[in-house]
Structure formats: C-alpha cells, structure tokens
Amino acid sequence: MSIVSRTFPAKVTKLIIFVTSQEFNKKGMRVIGIGETVLDILFKDDQPQKAVPGGSTFNSIISLGRAGVPCAMVTEAGGDHIGDITCRYLEENGVSAEFVCRHEGVKSHVSLAFLDEHNDAQYIFYKDHASVSMDGKLPRITSEDAVLFGSFFAINPAIRPVVGGLLHAAREAGAWIYYDVNFRKNHIADLPRVLPLAEENMGLADVVRGSTEDFGYLYGLQDGEAIYGRVGRFCRTLILTDGARAVRVFTPEGCETYPVPAIETVSTVGAGDNFNAGYIYATLRGFPDQTSRIAMASRWSQDVCRQMGNNISPELVASLQR
C-alpha cells in the first residue's frame, strides 16, 4: 500500500467559494444525525465546570447547525427537564427537533466527563441501553441528504430494527452516509452481538471514521493497514484518527497521512465529533480533495479543544461566513 504525507494549505477558507446557508436551503441539502443524546457534565480537578447537552452525533449536528447547515436530529430523550433542555438546545442552534422521540416517565441519559492533566476525558455514563426505544416520527431521507450516525446507538440491538431500517432506506435513496464507529471499552462484552451490526453499518457508509482506540476495542488491532484490511471489506474510505497524532485516510488507491498541528487544549471532549462535522461541512461545500476536507475537519476539532464545551465557537462560525 502506498503512503503519501500531505500538509495543510495555509488558508483553508481560500480554497473554494463557500455555499451560503441560503444556498444550502435552495439546493435542498440537509444533514440528518442519528444517535444518542446525553447531558454531559464536565469535571476538572473533581469539580463540575459545565453541563451541556451532548452525545457524539448530537455534538456534530449542533456544530453543523451553528455553521448554517440545515440539520435534523433523530434520537430519543426522556420526558423530563433534561429532555426539555436537549430539545431547546437543538432548536436554538438551528437543528430540527421534529424527530426527537420523547418518553414520558423515563429519565434522560447523563454522562460525567472527568478531565485529566492532559485534558483528556474519562467517562461515566448513566443510561440504560436496554430501555431505549424509538417509536416516534422518522424522516423521509432522499438523495439530497447526508446522514451521520454512530456510537452504540447505531448498533444497539434494542433499537436496531428502527435504526437499521432507516439506514437501509437512506442507502436505497442515494443519500451520502458517514459512519463514526466510536466504540467504547464498556461495550466489549457485547461484541459477539454487535460486531456484525457494526460491519453492516460500514457496508452502508460512504465514509467510515474511527480512532485507533475504537478499532483496538472492536478488532483488537492498532496497525492502520491491518484495520483497513478489515474495514475495507465493507467500505472503500476509512478515516483513521489517533488523538494528537497524524490523521490517515485509507482508500483502495493507498494511504495518505495528514499531520495534526500541536495546540494547547482546554478539553478534548467533542474533538472527534467536531472532526466529523468539519469533514461533512467541507464535503457539502464542495471542497475538492481530501487534503482540504481533512484540514477543515482538523480546524473544527482544534477549535472545540480550545474551550470547555462540545461545539464550535462563535469565532469559528464567524470566520466561516467571511
């Protein structure tokens, strides 16, 4: 497999003429996120710092909404105050909450994120995956749509009939599909049941994105070429991230490597989620090649790492509109 190293252009914003949010609407473009919602409570030195609605796909969709991309979120939440906060947060950031399935008498999920000395997060989740259900309104997906999905929500057997059916409908409609593996250590015991579902998801996707940590848990592999040897059976394009180390993009034509600039971090919560959002944003805006798309993805990821929050900053949003 050939390996090529790329460097980022000095000014990503000069690569193309941006599509405005009005033009997104004219073209009928929409990003549909499918994933869980949680209330993220961030801790530093064991003290709570911030509470904000989150979830992997949710974080991506909020950032895309802030950037002016028409979005909708397919998820579920309790019929409690946290669920109210979640739906309001979606709408405040320009994301449709029409497809949020609310369950009266059920508590919304909560996540505690403890930041270490490197500002990397260790998580404790308070949620019952077996009680999750999806019996609400679902979107009609068309070829004009992009679909982002991932995490355990995408392989949870309790809701697989609904989620799997929606993904197959998206594939048949000709939507562009991006799968974020985001497989956590606490689900290793579920692998015999969920690995076939994860690989089915890969087969439905145009792009698979995962970290070396994800695939270490999923396949017991750390080597990039070995990982692509598994993923490439199902999807032609794999984006492999590795924290602060270089991003690698694998295709049948070979592997390209993109160094990641070093930055001072405040929190790495949402780093991968906003990488996904930036890549999708660049793709929808017609960025011409992987170099420019990965550069924009890294720019979004780094922006969220410089703050205590899950989504891109107003400053980045303003820079996209120039």
Regions found by a protein language model. Give the residues of each.
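Low-acidity, Ser/Thr- and Arg-rich intrinsically disordered low-complexity segments
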Residues: 2-6
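Glycine-rich phosphate/adenosyl-contacting loop at the front of the ribokinase-like
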Residues: 9-10, 17-96
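Active-site metal-binding loops of divalent metal-dependent hydrolases
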Residues: 37, 56, 152, 181, ...
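Conserved N-terminal subdomain of the carbohydrate kinase-like
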Residues: 41, 70-151, 321-322
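Short, conserved phosphate/pyrophosphate- and ester-handling motifs at nucleotide-, phospho-/glycolipid
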Residues: 64, 211, 272
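Conserved phosphate/ATP/ADP-binding segment of small-molecule kinases
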Residues: 173, 185-257
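Short beta-strand/loop segments at the ligand-binding rim of alpha/beta enzyme cores
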Residues: 176-177
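Conserved post-catalytic alpha-helical subdomain immediately downstream of the catalytic base
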Residues: 237, 259-322
